[in-house]
Amino acid sequence: MHSLEVVELTFHGRGPYSFTIGGGECLGLAGPSGAGKTLLLRALADLDPHGGRISLGPLVCDQVPAPLWRRTVGMLPAESLWWYDRVGDHFVDFDRIPEQDLAMLGFDSSVRDWQISRLSSGEKQRLAILRLLQNRPRALLLDEPTASLDADNIGHVEELLTGYRREQGIPMLWVSHDPDQLERVAGRRLAMTADGRLLAGEA
């Protein structure tokens, strides 16, 4: 199990930030809108320019090709992008999705042929989670993964993501505005203040 180590991270005039997320650990991150939580995730995923050092075990962000880092450190944005109008075309191999994972999130194999344009925001989010997990990331960065879901699906998503983290022994950073959710899924929490400082504990 590898830890995600962040040392003196800076981006968009913010930071420096230093913290470690252990292998198999979920770190929760709370804070007001506009504080910079999404910017932090984007820097960790190497989607935005940044300074400092980010490493996952032997992999160092600035020393490997960006596509490799982004496959290894998977980020789920608050709103995922969809390029085609058929669900199955967004998956490397739709047939490799475990049937129990599809069922847990309220789908079966017929969803492969559904049209993206007819999906609700909640259906898109649940499918985005399945798409991300199919890549078998070795760390997860989650930007409010259940914000568009009802209570039942929130529970199913929490169960699926927590199960993946534990089975794979990966570090996970989970951003949420719901303190009760972070109490359920995260063993440790940080809070980002309105001026961008990171503090231990609740926001």
Which residues are covered by each model-predicted region?
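Hydrophobic anchor residue at the start of the ABC signature
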Residues: 128-129
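ABC ATPase NBD coupling module
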Residues: 60-74
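Helix-to-loop junction immediately C-terminal to a conserved catalytic motif
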Residues: 44-45
